[in-house]
């Protein structure tokens, strides 16, 4: 079973696109595992630095804006575009995904940020 972790800032349309693409994969392949690590923008830098140290993704700079995708086993996939290309398109055949500039991803990112803020206050 393939397992992926997709991490990103809640307000990032690129993360929203990766999340959307992953859900398209899950709709066709329910045995795939996808975990979403949606972080408040203020938490992102500390989070991504700890992930890069933990998995030895040393070539990512401290100010990497994300998103970042890796396997549960710790193999780096890359950023959102790498995930869409290598996993969604090439491995699972998901085609016709909207580009990151599609307005729906800005709306998803705004909704994600609202959710993270709500979760933060609980």
Give a label for each model feature.
Residues 1-45:
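Local sequence-structure signature of Cys/Sec-based thiol-disulfide redox active-site neighborhoods
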Residues 17-28, 48-58, 86-90:
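Short, aromatic/basic amphipathic alpha-helical patches
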Residues 29-33, 58-66, 94-96, 102-104:
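Glycine-rich loops and low-complexity Gly/Arg-rich segments
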Residues 46-47, 82:
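Exposed alpha-helical structural elements
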Residues 70-104:
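Non-catalytic, surface beta->alpha helical segment in thiol-disulfide oxidoreductase systems
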């Amino acid at each position: 079973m393939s397992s992926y972790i997709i991490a990103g800032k809640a307000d990032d349309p690129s993360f929203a696109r990766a999340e959307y693409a992953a859900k398209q994969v899950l709709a066709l392949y329910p045995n795939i595992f996808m975990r979403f690590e949606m972080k408040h923008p203020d938490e992102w830098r500390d989070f991504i630095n700890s992930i890069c140290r933990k998995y030895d993704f040393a070539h990512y700079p401290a100010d990497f804006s994300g998103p970042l995708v890796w396997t549960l086993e710790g193999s780096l996939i890359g950023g959102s575009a790498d995930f869409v290309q290598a996993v969604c398109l090439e491995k699972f055949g998901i085609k016709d995904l909207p580009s990151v500039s599609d307005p729906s991803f800005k709306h998803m990112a705004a909704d994600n940020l609202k959710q993270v803020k709500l979760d933060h206050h609980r």
